[in-house]
């Protein structure tokens, strides 16, 4: 959920995580990556027509503007019906306020003092307690036409 708070608050959150973790403690983060949106944009011809029609994002310009404006800045009032029963209402508390990539996380976490920043596959971990924790929206409509998450583990 770190993508739902702005960059300054996200940095404060990471600092607080570092402060309260015991030495050797592990933090795991999983969130969408801005690289995913860029991949969709640059590989638009590979996105299925079905996904484009269901999402209403039928051109790559419309897709990237939706991503930048609605998801990053927040948009009041638009309702997005995902599968006929679940609706996400855009409001300033829902949409993405800051999107990360691996380089950004790596820099910030190491600057704060974390060590061993490891980018891992979703649902996988060297720690049995951290395996399979990620949960994403389900349903017949897939929100992203590609896999685009960042999952990382880092130690204090």
Question: PLM features: residue spans?
Answer:
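A short His-aromatic
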Residues: 3-5
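S-adenosyl-L-methionine-dependent methyltransferase catalytic module, highlighting the catalytic core
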Residues: 7-22, 26-153
């Amino acid at each position: 959920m770190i993508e739902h708070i702005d960059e300054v608050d996200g940095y404060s959150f990471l600092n607080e995580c570092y402060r309260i973790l015991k030495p050797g403690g592990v933090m795991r983060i999983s969130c969408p990556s801005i690289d995913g949106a860029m991949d969709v944009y640059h590989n638009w011809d590979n996105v299925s027509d079905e996904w484009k029609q269901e999402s209403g994002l039928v051109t790559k310009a419309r897709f990237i503007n939706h991503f930048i404006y609605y998801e990053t800045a927040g948009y009041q009032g638009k309702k997005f019906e995902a599968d006929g029963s679940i609706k996400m209402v855009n409001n300033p508390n829902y949409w993405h306020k800051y999107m990360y990539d691996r380089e950004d996380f790596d820099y910030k976490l190491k600057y704060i003092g974390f060590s061993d920043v490891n980018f891992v596959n979703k649902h996988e971990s060297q720690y049995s307690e951290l395996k399979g924790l990620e949960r994403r929206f389900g349903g017949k409509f897939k929100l992203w036409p590609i896999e685009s998450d960042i999952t990382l583990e880092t130690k204090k």
